[in-house]
């Protein structure tokens, strides 16, 4: 059993307190009663909202923890009357904002909160997170006294020595980015050699549908080639399609696979029939009652600690059939392989909201718009008024002053201190359609919603059906119910998020809520999501600039940000929000935020058979992956312009695919041939010869008892098939119509042989 010992003392008594773990790992940080912080959420209903500081720390598994607070300066203010916090409002159009709450529990002549330090331990496979809250303000309602810790030093000691070894993957990197003590972590980069398939970085689960599974394998190939070890499994292989069984399976995968997945994709629509879709948790605990039940919660499938937080990223492509799977996978691949070069697409992100004086809709989007404007973009604002007047005040909601102080003129200066800078309030759905048609890399809508609509400016699935935008957008739909992927049952009646993905145009990924959510909690989550995509957005949370802008990982990051905001209050609403907000799309989709540039790459065109390494020169920070026959053999990162990758000895005739990726850069793909034998005769292995290579027009295959030949593109799709070939001594295949590029040829004889060739 892990234990935590908490000591609180005044500076004058410091010498009388000897730390329990004096010679082991410890970490100290300073605390001030800072009113200008990103702890935006109010306290729980019926209690005063007070200043506090919440921080994440990485700690060794099974370590005992000691938390010390050395109070350097404190004060007491008399005759302070603090109002009780009202209950959080649901995002219903008929909602009246905050409602008063019972305050009787405060009047017992004790300080609230009762403890100066509150903590929660979050368990993971390699390490734990310790979430610590220091109450810099405490209140005695009977005496009307406000007790303030003006300065303090907090020290966390453990009984462990040395650094924590953590598997290097995108999810762990995301978690460590939010801790105050990242230096305790040593990321372990494990070698990736042929023949190791004990685990995967990325798990794709499909229904028992062969056609959908084939498209999952196409996505697997695309991700594997860029260095993300990917595995596809059907529900038949998992043996269950109930949410409890899926969760138990994913938990076993998380704790036992090597490598363990950082993300899982459910490539299928919601359905309890394993041939038609993939199930999810159907929750019956909505605070507003049965009218909003059941609601779907994919997040619970990966919430292994049952605390509302994901232990890995979960994403869903809601494909109800093979056609939809094809469309969604192809959207992803086309977007990354051929990103748009139009500068206007990146220069004009779009925010849209309906002003409601009692809510934060307008703050949620304007803060994002202000950030974009301060970073050399010209945000396209599409706004309307639900409840006014929209002439001065940002909002009458509690804690609005904290939000404005932090993001306003006295803080980050993303927004002015009032809303008078906005004057256009008559936008409508046509304006939203035009923004999408013209191209915008990012669109957020913030208002009330229904299954098929955004409230104001009004926009519906009918508007989506009419879109012909060739440049796809990433869409954040924080509006209620717009991500209810159990709604309807056919293409004519699906939720707004699904419709964005199911048309040929629209969006390549969407974040949306599966039911009615709560104001302020969902706004805070949204700012957390945005901080992952643009890490300087909230400077006092997280300190990493991630290699890629993965919106699926941003969805998870936003939930960890929400958890610590005004921790430990409103925890049930935070869990509800985390369960409601879903990411629809490929888990490793990277969104482009600037006009892409080419990666400068130099590598040998050939290697000798038996080679075990290759040196590649490339722009620093580029991720490099080598694969043979769609199986990763090595990966690394260019540092100071170069990287040497090591692998098992390569065989004569093999073709190594080289893929480089980097945020806001074009994906680079090229080949390295493993030479040996007579180049004039081509690639030779056993009794099979393929020549010439590269080929201009006619490819020749020589061998005995060849029964079938398939030529596939680098997505694994069959382009040419030549059957019943065993009577010919040399088989000739016309390749003149093939676009120039890399291809694979699968030759079926007594065994199956796979070759690569270049056109």
Annotate each PLM feature.
Residues 1-24:
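Bacterial Sec-dependent N-terminal signal peptides
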Residues 8, 15, 283-284, 296-297, ...:
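Intrinsically disordered, low-complexity peptide-like regions
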Residues 15-17, 190-195, 691:
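Short, flexible, solvent-exposed loop/turn segments with mixed acidic/basic and small polar residues
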Residues 23-674:
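Cysteine-dependent hydrolase recognition
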Residues 672-677, 757-759:
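Short beta-strand edge segments in extracellular beta-sheet folds
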Residues 680-681:
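Ser/Thr/Gly/Pro-rich low-complexity, disordered linker/stalk segments of secreted
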């Amino acid at each position: 059993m892990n234990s935590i010992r908490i000591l609180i003392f005044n500076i004058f008594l410091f010498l009388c307190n000897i730390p329990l773990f004096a010679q082991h790992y410890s970490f100290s940080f300073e605390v001030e009663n800072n009113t200008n912080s990103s702890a935006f959420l109010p306290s729980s209903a019926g209690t005063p909202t007070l200043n506090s500081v919440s921080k994440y720390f990485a700690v060794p598994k099974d370590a005992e923890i000691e938390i010390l607070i050395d109070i350097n300066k404190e004060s007491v203010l008399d005759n302070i009357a603090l109002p009780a916090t009202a209950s959080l409002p649901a995002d219903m159009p008929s909602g009246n904002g905050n409602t008063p709450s019972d305050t009787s529990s405060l009047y017992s002549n004790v300080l609230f909160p009762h403890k100066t330090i509150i903590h929660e331990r979050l368990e993971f496979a390699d390490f734990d997170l310790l979430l610590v809250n220091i109450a810099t303000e405490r209140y005695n309602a009977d005496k009307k006294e406000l007790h303030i810790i003006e300065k303090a030093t907090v020290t966390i000691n453990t009984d462990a020595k040395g650094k924590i070894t953590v598997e290097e993957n995108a999810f762990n990197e995301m978690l460590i980015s939010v801790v105050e003590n990242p230096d305790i972590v040593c990321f372990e980069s494990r070698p990736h050699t042929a023949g190791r398939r004990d685990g995967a970085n990325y798990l794709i689960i499909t229904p028992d549908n062969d056609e959908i599974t084939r498209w999952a394998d196409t996505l697997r190939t695309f991700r594997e080639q860029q260095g993300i070890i990917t595995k596809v499994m059907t529900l038949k292989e998992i043996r269950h399609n109930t949410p409890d069984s899926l969760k138990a399976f994913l938990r076993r995968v998380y704790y036992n696979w090597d490598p363990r997945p950082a993300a899982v994709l459910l490539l299928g629509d919601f359905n309890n029939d394993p041939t038609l879709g993939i199930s999810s948790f159907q929750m019956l605990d909505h605070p507003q009652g049965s009218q909003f039940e059941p609601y779907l919660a994919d997040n619970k499938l990966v919430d292994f600690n049952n605390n509302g937080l994901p232990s890995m990223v979960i994403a869903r492509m809601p494909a109800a059939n093979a056609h939809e799977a094809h469309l969604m996978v192809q959207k992803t691949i086309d977007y990354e392989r051929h990103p748009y070069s139009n500068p206007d697409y990146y220069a004009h992100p779009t925010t849209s909201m309906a002003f409601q004086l009692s809510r934060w809709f307008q703050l949620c989007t304007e803060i994002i718009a202000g950030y974009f404007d301060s970073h050399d973009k010209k945000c396209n604002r599409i706004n309307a008024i639900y409840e006014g007047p929209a002439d001065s005040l940002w909002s009458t909601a509690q804690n609005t002053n904290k939000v404005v102080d932090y993001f306003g003129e006295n803080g980050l200066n993303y927004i002015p201190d009032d809303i008078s800078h906005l004057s256009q309030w008559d936008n409508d759905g046509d304006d939203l359609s035009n923004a999408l048609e013209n191209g915008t890399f990012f669109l957020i809508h913030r208002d009330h919603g229904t299954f098929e609509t955004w409230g104001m400016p009004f926009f519906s699935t009918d508007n989506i059906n009419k879109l012909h935008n060739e440049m796809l957008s990433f869409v954040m739909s924080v509006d209620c119910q717009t991500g209810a992927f159990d709604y309807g049952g056919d293409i004519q009646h699906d939720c707004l998020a699904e419709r964005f993905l199911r048309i040929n145009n629209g969006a390549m990924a969407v974040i949306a809520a599966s039911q009615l959510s709560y104001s302020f909690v969902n706004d805070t989550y949204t700012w957390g999501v945005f901080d992952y995509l643009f890490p300087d957005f909230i400077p006092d949370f997280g300190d990493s600039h991630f290699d890629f802008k993965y919106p699926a990982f941003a969805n998870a990051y936003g939930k960890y940000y929400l958890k610590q905001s005004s921790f430990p209050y409103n925890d049930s609403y935070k869990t509800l929000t985390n369960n409601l907000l879903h990411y629809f799309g490929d888990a490793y989709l990277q969104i482009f935020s600037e006009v892409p540039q080419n990666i400068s790459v130099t590598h040998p065109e050939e290697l000798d058979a038996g080679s075990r390494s290759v040196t590649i020169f490339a722009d620093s920070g580029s991720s490099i992956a080598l694969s043979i026959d769609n199986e990763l053999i090595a990966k690394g990162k260019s540092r100071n312009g170069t990287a040497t990758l090591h692998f098992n000895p390569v065989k004569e005739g093999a073709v190594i695919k080289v893929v480089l990726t980097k945020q806001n850069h074009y994906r680079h793909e090229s080949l390295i041939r493993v030479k040996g034998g007579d180049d004039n005769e081509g690639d030779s292995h056993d009794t099979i010869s393929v020549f010439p290579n590269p080929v201009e027009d006619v490819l020749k295959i020589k061998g005995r008892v060849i029964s079938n030949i398939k030529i596939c593109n680098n997505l694994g799709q069959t382009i040419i098939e030549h059957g019943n070939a065993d009577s010919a001594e040399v088989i000739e295949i016309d390749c003149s119509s093939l676009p120039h590029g890399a291809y694979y040829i699968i030759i079926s004889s007594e065994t199956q042989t796979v070759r690569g060739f270049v056109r």
